Amino acid sequence: MTRQQTKKNYSLRKLKTGTASVAVALTVLGAGFANQTTVKAEGAKIDWQEEYKKLDEDNAKLVEVVETTSLENEKLKSENEENKKNLDKLSKENQGKLEKLELDYLKKLDHEHKEHQKEQQEQEERQKNQEQLERKYQREVEKRYQEQLQKQQQLETEKQISEASRKSLSRDLEASRAAKKDLEAEHQKLEAEHQKLKEDKQISDASRQGLSRDLEASRAAKKELEANHQKLEAEHQKLKEDKQISDASRQGLSRDLEASRAAKKELEANHQKLEAEAKALKEQLAKQAEELAKLRAGKASDSQTPDTKPGNKAVPGKGQAPQAGTKPNQNKAPMKETKRQLPSTGETANPFFTAAALTVMATAGVAAVVKRKEEN
């Protein structure tokens, strides 16, 4: 529509130009006729021949002008047709170029749109991946924080348990030392009684040799001595049973000591593996090692406690006669079994519950704490 309208406007401008030329010529001719008429009206003396000649010349000029105008009009029409053809050609070329440009522009625009969509999708994908990584990292950080918090709480709990165990062992150690002192006092008392019995026996033997003539008195003294002997035999049997119990307890402590050494070896192996984690507990383990050294020192002092001497035992089957005027010691205090209660549990403490047992218990407790840390 636009190209056709342009062609029409161009043709109209050409036609208007030709028409304007004709109108100019006619105006000139009309002016000439008007002048001639005016001249005729004003003067009657004008020569008609000259007027005719002049009109003929004017007519020739007008014909020439009309011919010239017609030629120009034809020329303009030809030019107009040529211009129309050129305009159509240029319009077609411009239309093809315009369509090509529009097609290229649309292709370029479509390509840019696709590239933009692709970049936008990639950006959205990167944003999505970034958000997923951030959520994953946040969850991982939260998980590690909770794990560290649980480990710290567990370490605090184990530290409290270890502290309570250490205090309990300290109380048990004090009770064991007190029981040991009581046992040593009782042992010294029994040792003095055995020494006294030994002296009495020596005196009785000497008296029996000196008083062999007095048979009746000797028989009476013999009966009394046999009664004392039975009493001493009962005491000796009681001491023998205590010795058997002590031997059994010592064997049990030996087994516990072997188990403690095995646990100690395992603890040392685990300690080498957990050296990095054990730095935080180094000070506490050093304190426990010092307490263990004290317990071992207590054990060493316990191992030096003297047992009942064989020379103090009464010899069964032999009669003893006292000297004249002497009487056997009948005011012997019966042996009392020393019983104490542990302050931590309230149970009756074994008098043979020595520092070796405490050492085993402390070592086993430390091994259990370290093993729990390794499992965690």
Curated annotation (Swiss-Prot):
Compositionally biased spans, kind Basic and acidic residues: 72-146, 156-203, 211-245, 253-271
Propeptide section residues: 346-376
Region spans: Disordered: 69-271, 292-348
Annotated Pfam families: Gram_pos_anchor, M, YSIRK_signal
GO molecular function: IgG binding
Sites bearing Pentaglycyl murein peptidoglycan amidated threonine, chain numbering: T345
Protein family according to the UniProt entry: Belongs to the M protein family.
UniProt-recorded name of the protein: Immunoglobulin G-binding protein H
